[in-house]
Amino acid sequence: MEVTPNHTQTVSGWAAMDESGKIVPFVFKRRENGVDDVTIKVKYCGMCHTDLHFIHNDWGITMYPVVPGHEITGVVTKVGTNVAGFKVGDRVGVGCIAASCLDCEHCRRSEENYCDKVALTYNGIFWDGSITYGGYSGMLVAHKRFVVRIPDTLPLDAAAPLLCAGITVYSPMKQHGMLQADAAGRRLGVVGLGGLGHVAVKFGKAFGLHVTVISTSPAKEREARENLKADNFVVSTDQKQMQAMTRSLDYIIDTVAATHSLGPILELLKVNGKLVLVGAPEKPVELPSFPLIFGKRTVSGSMTGGMKETQEMMDICGEHNITCDIEIVSTDRINDALARLARNDVRYRFVINVGGDSKL
């Protein structure tokens, strides 16, 4: 494993310097391109709720200054001598992972996201001991293992959030058999219609599932049905609507990050139904045992995805023309966008125009 300790490249970016979370211009150093590395000119970077948690140190682990961003797309400007899969000019992306041990059981199965030594794209510790900086910056140096190709059919701006939101829902949908050919016609419930939820709806429809959106907001029904082509919409606070859906769904993807009870949601599953949690509430969710026991139901969780799955997902998105619905923001409006993101005032993902052209 080649390590490149010489951080000599000066890079301009945007960072939070303290728990106020205010993003300011920040000049820092990145490592030189190593033999296994790919240097990328950043074009676009999506804004994730995780960025909010890190800039405000909500989890008590932020290492300031922190340069956020793990939904990164751009163009290759340099490749190392050991890099065979990429060349200068390629359209590429980098998601949540900067490094892993490459040798454990998880890495050997391309489940790098579950490696004990995983290093995140930002606020992580890289192999050489340096702190990782994310995609709110003009360029990035990434190990070849953690770079994916972006199909020519996908715009770089709308593809960026797929590297987090997309893979976060794709991975469990694949692992639990929702995207297999024989799953067509089965019934999927998507709890929450935000950055993750709207992509889950798109995957479900692309693979022939009957999709029901489950939301606390009646105002989202038109959006779900008309724009995302959901087959059904249920207001989770309406007891009559929820009771009418009892034992009707084969699968449920719960994308909600707010604390909520899983009991009413579990009742919507058929016997042997599967509920997958991908949202991360700050407080524990309520999980009653009776709906599990009497319905032989399964609850599981999932955290992003490995690199093989991420490339597979991106290729499928290229084939089915699946992208995220986004709002482009300029670098001088990052703080405004973060404030709106904190209020969930976005449909459905902000993407920073770092150095790109939305027509790419």
From Swiss-Prot:
PANTHER family for this protein: ALDEHYDE REDUCTASE (PTHR42683)
Task performed by this protein: Involved in lignin biosynthesis. Catalyzes the final step specific for the production of lignin monomers. Catalyzes the NADPH-dependent reduction of coniferaldehyde, 5-hydroxyconiferaldehyde, sinapaldehyde, 4-coumaraldehyde and caffeyl aldehyde to their respective alcohols.
Binding site for Zn(2+) 1: 48, 70-71, 164
Keywords: Lignin biosynthesis, Metal-binding, NADP, Oxidoreductase, Zinc
Quaternary state and interactors: Homodimer.
The gene coding this protein: CAD6
Gene source species: Oryza sativa subsp. japonica
Residues engaged in binding NADP(+): 50, 168, 192-197, 215-220, 255, 279, 302-304
Record protein name field: Probable cinnamyl alcohol dehydrogenase 6
Highest taxon of source: Eukaryota
EC number: 1.1.1.195
Gene3D superfamilies: Medium-chain alcohol dehydrogenases, catalytic domain, NAD(P)-binding Rossmann-like Domain
Assigned protein family: Belongs to the zinc-containing alcohol dehydrogenase family.
UniProt: Zn(2+) 2 binding residues: 101, 104, 107, 115
EC class (word): oxidoreductase
Lineage, broadest ranks: Eukaryota, Viridiplantae, Streptophyta, Embryophyta, Tracheophyta
Cofactor: Zn(2+)
